[in-house]
Amino acid sequence: METEDWFKLKRYPHIGEPLSLKDYKWIKAYVENPVSVKKHSFLPLIHKCIIKRKYRADTVNLVRNKKTGERMRFIDKPKVRHIYYASHLDSIVFSYYNHLISEAYEKLIATKNFNESIVAYRKIPITKGSDKNKCNIDFAKSTFEFIKKNEEKKLTAIVADVTAFFDNLDHKVLKKQWCKVLNLKTLPEDHYNVFKALTKLRYVESDQLFNSYKGSMLVERGVPNSYKEKEIKRIEIESNKYFKEKNAVAYCTKEEFIQNNLNLIISGKNKKGIPQGSPISATLANVYMLSFDQEVYDKVEAIGGYYQRYSDDLIIVCEQKYEDEIIKYIRDKVQNLAKLEIHPSKTTVYRFEEINGIFKGYEIDEKSKERNYNKSLEYLGFIFDGQRVLIKDSGFSKFYRSMKRSFKKSTSLALYSKNPDKRIFKPKLYKRFTHRGAKRKLIYHPSKTDPTIYERTKKYYWGNYLSYIYKANDSMRSLNDGRDIIKRQSRKFWNQFHKLMRFHESRLIKQK
């Protein structure tokens, strides 16, 4: 069945059972009817905290590990992201209105001179008429190319990160810009109901809802002696990390929630901010920054500079003589026009100039102007020092940690499964963590009428992290003097993979 792009089914557990393709017709009629959406009662969001550990190389002391020779790392303050999940029907309502607002935004921004400077959450074709869109690799490359093309000048690159972007969006500014995109003086009643659902935050803590049912969840199970039939039943689950394994589909039904859990609803008295994680949040972030983007672009263009914004990360490249003026200007516009804030520690200043005949980039202290030649421009996951482009080490570290976790999990499954061989399932690991799974392929499924025939789908197997590395290498090769510098960064993964394989296979042998 052909469906609209905005019809996106989710499988995460929420209040009420997930929707299915069978629901498409009535959902389409419902969300496309402004009267229905105007009266729609949104369920509370479910709130979770995602905590990510952050490791940083010590660029001050430059102490190296005696065994490996690598720079020592320290654990930085963990990054906490507050994610809010909408119920399944609410999510599709948000998705549909995201579609409407996104279309209106794209139509408006196409008439603006800063159209190509706003790059996050948008489908920007690689070339005009192409069905392939740009990604962060292309956006970073265009920034580095601008610097490289102007290497006869003394340049400054200012990278700023807006503090707690989604949490601090001013509701009055958002509403004003929303109206601007729709070319209306006030929001229609259906749009206003969606606006209220996002700004008058009501949510439930996931752990509290889980515990209120004594650690049990509604799960989907197959019916005995039936190939197709499914049933929903409540079972006890030890913790939320087993939700996917047990095929948990809901914390409770809508009726159970109304009867038992209304006391768990937290009404956030938030005068600013929208929930991060809803299908509409990303588009609204771009809508919110419309006036800011216009004024900053005009200012930077007037001095022959370069401006690009990727969500809450923005970069400006200008001549060094405008450095202090632009830093002050950006802070003023973020605070007074966008009603947001840039934390001083989140603003990094780099300079590019010729040193001893070599065009070189380095970091400077904003106040003291002290130079740090050990730090180069970091933007969108890449490092650029004026001569070459590399992928940041943090990306490789994340991939390696993921590899280690997968080996541990595979070993545990081999040890405690009913499989008498007690062997690691190698094909899956090779596909996920080596070049063998790096090729991107179109997915084919067996035909429903004839299982011996495979039919082409619209889905792709997008490869693994090495696919991204190879793509980045090909794209950045022109900036790396035709060399495969980025590809060389990944050479150690093959040895690391087999080192882990030998270690975990020896563990299994000892356990037999």
Model-derived regions, located:
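Non-catalytic, polymerase-adjacent accessory regions of viral genome-replication enzymes
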Residues: M1-K79, S490-K512
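Conserved pre-motif C helix in the palm subdomain of viral-like polymerases
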Residues: P78-E116, T163-F166, K269-D298
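Right-hand nucleic-acid polymerase module
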Residues: S87, S91, S95-Y97, A104, ...
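Active-site-proximal segment of RNA-dependent polymerases
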Residues: N98-H171, Y192-G215
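Beta-rich nucleic-acid/ligand-interaction surfaces
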Residues: I118-K123, I315-C318, T348-I358
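Conserved polymerase palm-domain catalytic core
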Residues: E152-Y310, I315-Y329, N374
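Short, conserved secondary-structure transition motifs
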Residues: F195-S212, T347-D365
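Helical (often loop-to-helix) elements that flank the catalytic cores of nucleotide-handling enzymes
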Residues: Q320-P344
